[in-house]
Amino acid sequence: MITTLTANPSLDRTVTLAGELVPGGVHRISSDVTGPGGKGINVALGIARAGLDVLAIFPAAPGDPLVGLLDGLGLPHRETPTSGRVRTNLAVLSEPGVTTKINEPGSALSPSEVSALEDVLTSAVSAGDIAMLSGSLAPGIPADEYARLVGLLQARGVWVGVDTSDEPLLALAAAAPQGAPDFLKPNAEELGQL
């Protein structure tokens, strides 16, 4: 089983403009698509498409639209209840092939919501499983959360991968070599942060 943790999930909205994006201008949208997002959810969707057993874990308020989208796609998931809504990330596609991204920070999680997320993750995995910790951390989650989770999961015999950046990546590096994940997926920019 592969379990993904998306600590800061999103609704990814992509709008395509009929022309060039001009700051301060009025623009017409030629298409508007919203889908589930967050690195861990994207990983889980890819794993499911490959026909492998996967479970996506993420925080979301009861009735959040993200849950409905994942239900509609048939992706196995467990969400931990939160008081805030899932963030929306906006991508604006305009001529001549330019993409502008605007990302919300996400709703802050309380210490009890962070603890519930950890509990769901650790109870979902068994020795020999793979856990993928992916993406940014929601506000309220300590920067060293992934580093802590690596140790907790590896102590249970779980293989752990991490795909993150900025402060969580630096905290992971600071915990190495004892708290090093089994695999790490940095891009060129993230490698430069180390």
Question: What does each model-identified segment do?
Answer:
Residues 130-194:
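Conserved beta-alpha-beta core of the PfkB/ribokinase-like small-molecule kinase fold
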Residues 10-12, 97-100, 138, 191:
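Short, acidic Gly/Pro/Ser/Thr-rich loop/turn segments
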Residues 1-3, 100, 129-130, 183:
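Structural motif
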Residues 1, 53-55, 76, 158-159, ...:
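Residues at the starts of beta-strands that form the adenosine-phosphate
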Residues 1-55:
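Glycine-rich phosphate/adenosyl-contacting loop at the front of the ribokinase-like
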Residues 5-9, 59-61, 82, 136, ...:
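Cofactor-binding loop segments of dinucleotide-utilizing enzymes, especially the Rossmann-like FAD-
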Residues 23, 48-130:
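Conserved N-terminal subdomain of the carbohydrate kinase-like
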